[in-house]
């Protein structure tokens, strides 16, 4: 057999099928952008659904790919078995109504057995087929020459996921030899059984039937081929190693972990071997997922990443690694995969930062969490129960960042289980609290009742006009149809034509008025009705508004003008964030009002001051360049080909609205915008903050609001300069001078305090008492803080040579206590930490520390003298 690397096998597969007329489909992102049914891309065919279901006709009906994939349904098995992975590559060849069984089988056999390609010994290959698939049997037996005893008929060789395309499949197995099993009395020792000897190499699915709703099967007019070969498994066979982890796709990460830990892989310790495997698998998954735009969080795919990283950190402790280290493996993954996935090395710095940040977050709470979990397990055992309560599991998740699955693994090792239902109940309570906190009492929350029945047409024309002649086509009051609204009454209405924008896409609704003879109606808010019309929330200020009334609908143009400036500014900001922070930045939410804009985006850490400055400057430069804003309607595929940014998770129709700011920004957006960036005037960032793991928020203002903000800041600067008796341009010099003066005064003050402390310490030596042969000093002193107290303690210990000393000071009703024990007395059982804890407890406080020096605090200054009196009792108790 040839000696090949994993990278060579991958390339060889693609080259082979390219020679057979296949188009090579690039590996798609792990984050599915067109399939909301998937959390991750989990197979080679997952990205080709659009071709198989007919939504898109491929240029070439023959396709081959090497698709990176993630499956996380059995994370707990990773590391325990030879071939379970969360990240893997699936090699496949596909036919969309072109060739079928004969070509698929012939080419698979050629690729595996030809000396030009893999070069397997034909005698070591067996195949399985469906019992009724005589066509496949004939091809294997008569054309490929596979003896009938190596063609096994299995009922499970039928691919069916319910309604839709289905069909039989054939699998090819490689015999690894007797070293992996020679007990032929084992009922599982056959190709297709659960064993380590016969490994599945390739699965060929023949989609030839349609599974109908009534359960029947009818032939498909166009038959398809869908095959899959796991690269990791194939590599383990070619490289003749016992598990996938022993291939060159994993060993570099395992080797790097050996270097970091000082431990050895395959050194006879199965528990440590499992840790090496878990780390190698999980870092591959996290590296690729972060590179494709996913970030750790507590929801969805972000939760999967958090769980994987924290599981790896947990296993790293078995290798005596007690610090963040996974981030150091990111460039190792990049090197292994660089031939086919060069983007990993290109993004390695960013990916490593994300991983390190997440590791550091977990390490901060890991120790405390493990201690709490140990207490929970101990308590459960005392109570003779083998179940960890849902409340405790939720506390570990919510406070210490322990994914429920991690708690379950710890519990399993202790012979216990977790009350998963109780945990989910606690999670739901938290979600309810969050939902209650988010509710906006001013928004139109309820749109049920008669609103769901209203299906009259309503056309929005507000992109191009700010006022229209309209008719009231529906009127609702108190959730019921109404014929009229009187002055002072509130209601909801629809217009046949409206210039009022309904709140959506982060942009707030227009406000304004409806006017008619003797009638004036304030439009307070506009939302989408259940059937998609613009629903206006109104208050009648004058007259009576009737259904079918003709009105003039006029929006507040001043308000709209401010809103559109802020909306276009969010588009400029989005692109500037990508330019400065990286292409991983994606919009996570926004709010566009007339006063300000708020933009939430994915990013792993705080945006630095210099980065914010750069972002702000870029946006302003684009404003000052006076760029025209062009808006057009495009087919969704055309818009994506243009590179238009789509908001992840949003559903778009076949035709979309594209907002283009010159050649700088291109987004799909249904909102209102300026005609030219110059209209925005100026852009000023007000704040940047984190609103959750992996999500940041920028708040900013534009136009008049930005001018007023800057005016206020200049006013404050002038006021500060006046108080410092200087002018604004010299204020920094003046501040530096004041800091220097303060520093000098602090130095002089500390020097003076030290002298006074020394004097007081000298005086205190006269107060030393001898208790059972031990020098004891317990005194209340006048010093400013704990630092001065320590200085005095050092002086006294030096002067007395052998003593137990406790000093206390009171400042602003706060008690500081310091205990010291000289070295000679520590060996006799005296302990400063234990002593100071007892003293502090007698004046309402607590503390502790080392045997030679310890500090504490108290809350009751009036009890200090009484507390200090205890010192003599303590010395007597130890000397007995």
From Swiss-Prot:
Question: What stretches pass through the bilayer?
Answer: none
Q: Where in the cell is it found?
A: Cytoplasm
Per the record, what are the reactions this protein catalyses? Answer: tRNA(Ala) + L-alanine + ATP = L-alanyl-tRNA(Ala) + AMP + diphosphate
Q: Any signal peptide, and if so, which residues?
A: none
Q: Which GO terms describe its biological process?
A: alanyl-tRNA aminoacylation
InterPro entries per record = aa-tRNA-synth_II/BPL/LPL, Ala-tRNA-lgiase_IIc, Ala-tRNA-ligase_IIc_anticod-bd, Ala-tRNA-synth_IIc_core, Ala-tRNA-synth_IIc_N, Ala-tRNA_ligase, Ala_tRNA_ligase_euk/bac, DHHA1_dom
What family does this chain come from, according to its entry?
A: Belongs to the class-II aminoacyl-tRNA synthetase family.
The record's annotation in NCBIfam families points to: alaS
- Protein name per UniProt: Alanine--tRNA ligase
Give the species this sequence originates from.
Answer: Bacillus cereus (strain ATCC 10987 / NRS 248)
């Amino acid at each position: 057999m040839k000696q090949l690397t994993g990278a060579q096998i991958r390339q060889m597969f693609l080259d082979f099928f390219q020679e057979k007329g296949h188009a090579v489909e690039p590996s798609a992102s792990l984050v599915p952008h067109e399939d909301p049914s998937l959390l991750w891309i989990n197979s080679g065919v997952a990205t080709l659904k659009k071709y198989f279901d007919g939504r898109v006709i491929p240029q070439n009906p023959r396709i081959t790919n090497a698709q990176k994939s993630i499956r996380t349904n059995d994370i707990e098995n990773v590391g325990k078995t030879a071939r379970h992975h969360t990240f893997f590559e699936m090699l496949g060849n596909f036919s969309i109504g072109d060739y079928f069984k004969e070509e698929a089988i012939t080419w698979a056999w050629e690729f595996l057995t030809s000396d030009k390609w893999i070069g397997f010994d034909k005698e070591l290959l067996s195949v399985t087929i469906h019992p009724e698939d005589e066509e496949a049997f004939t091809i294997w037996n008569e054309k490929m020459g596979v003896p009938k005893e190596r063609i096994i008929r299995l009922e499970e060789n039928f691919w069916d996921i319910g309604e839709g395309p289905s069909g039989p499949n054939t699998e090819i197995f490689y015999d690894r030899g007797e070293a992996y099993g020679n007990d032929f009395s084992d009922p599982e020792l056959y190709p297709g059984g659960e064993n380590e000897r016969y490994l599945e190499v390739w699965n060929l699915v023949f989609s030839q039937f349609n599974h109908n709703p009534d359960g029947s099967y009818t032939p498909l007019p166009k038959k398809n081929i869908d095959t899959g070969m796991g690269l990791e498994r194939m590599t383990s066979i070619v490289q003749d190693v016992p598990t996938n982890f022993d291939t060159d796709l994993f060993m570099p990460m395992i080797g790097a972990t050996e270097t970091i830990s000082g431990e050895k892989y395959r050194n006879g310790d199965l528990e440590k071997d499992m840790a090496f495997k878990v780390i190698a698998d999980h870092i591959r998954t996290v590296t690729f997922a972060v590179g494709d735009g996913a970030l750790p969080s507590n929801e969805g795919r972000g939760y999967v990443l958090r769980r994987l990283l924290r599981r790896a950190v947990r296993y790293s402790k078995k290798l005596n690694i007690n610090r963040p280290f996974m981030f150091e493996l990111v460039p190792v993954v990049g090197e292994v995969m660089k031939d086919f996935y060069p983007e990993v090395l290109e993004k390695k710095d960013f990916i490593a930062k994300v991983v390190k940040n997440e590791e550091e977050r977990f390490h901060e709470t890991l120790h405390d969490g493990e201690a709490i979990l140990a207490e929970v397990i101990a308590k459960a055992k005392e109570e003779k129960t083998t179940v960890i309560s849902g409340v405790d599991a939720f506390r570990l998740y919510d406070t210490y960042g322990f994914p429920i699955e991690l708690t379950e693994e710890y519990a399993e090792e202790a012979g216990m289980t977790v009350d998963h239902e109780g945990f989910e109940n606690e999670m739901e309570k938290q979600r309810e609290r969050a939902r209650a906190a988010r509710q906006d009492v001013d928004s139109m929350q309820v749109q049920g009742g008669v609103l769901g029945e209203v299906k009259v047409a309503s056309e929005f024309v507000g992109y191009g006009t700010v006022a229209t002649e309209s008719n009231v086509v529906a009127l609702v009051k108190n959730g019921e149809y109404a014929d009229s609204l009187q002055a002072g009454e509130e209601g909801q209405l629809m217009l046949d034509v409206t210039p009022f924008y309904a709140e959506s896409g982060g942009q707030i609704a227009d406000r304004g008025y409806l006017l008619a003879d003797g009638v004036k109606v304030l439009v307070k808010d506009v939302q989408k009705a259940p059937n998609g019309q613009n629903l206006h929330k109104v208050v009648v200020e004058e007259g009576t508004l009737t259904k079918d009334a003709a009105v003039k609908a006029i929006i507040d143009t001043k308000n709209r003008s401010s809103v559109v400036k802020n909306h276009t500014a969010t588009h400029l900001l989005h692109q500037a964030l990508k330019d400065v922070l990286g292409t991983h930045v994606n919009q996570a939410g926004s709010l566009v009002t007339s006063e300000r804009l708020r933009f939430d985006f994915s990013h792993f850490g705080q945006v630095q001051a210099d980065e914010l400055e750069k972002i702000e400057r870029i946006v302003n430069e684009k404003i000052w360049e006076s760029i025209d804003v062009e808006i057009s309607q495009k087919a969704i595929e055309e818009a994506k080909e243009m590179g238009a940014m789509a908001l992840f998770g949003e559903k778009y129709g076949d035709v979309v609205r594209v907002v283009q700011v010159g050649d700088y920004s291109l987004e799909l957006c249904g909102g209102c915008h300026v005609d030219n960036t110059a209209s925005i005037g100026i852009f000023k960032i007000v704040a940047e903050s984190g609103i959750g793991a992996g999500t940041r928020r920028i708040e900013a203002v534009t136009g008049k609001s930005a001018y007023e903000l800057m005016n206020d800041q200049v006013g404050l600067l002038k006021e500060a300069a006046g108080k410092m008796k200087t002018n604004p341009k010299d204020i920094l010099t003046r501040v530096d001078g004041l800091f220097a003066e303060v520093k000098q005064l602090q130095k002089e003050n500390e020097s003076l305090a030290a002298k006074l402390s020394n004097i007081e310490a000298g005086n205190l030596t006269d107060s030393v008492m001898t208790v059972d042969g031990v020098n004891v000093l317990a005194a209340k002193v006048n010093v400013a803080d704990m630092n001065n107290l320590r200085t005095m303690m050092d002086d006294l210990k030096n002067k007395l040579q052998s003593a137990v000393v406790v000093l206390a000071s009171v400042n602003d009703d706060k008690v500081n206590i310091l205990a010291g024990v000289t070295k000679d007395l520590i060996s006799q059982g005296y302990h400063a930490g234990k002593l100071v804890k007892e003293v502090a407890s007698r004046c309402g406080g607590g503390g502790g520390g080392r045997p030679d020096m310890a500090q504490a605090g108290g809350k009751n200054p009036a009890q200090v003298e009484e507390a200090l009196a205890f010192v003599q009792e303590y010395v007597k108790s130890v000397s007995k």
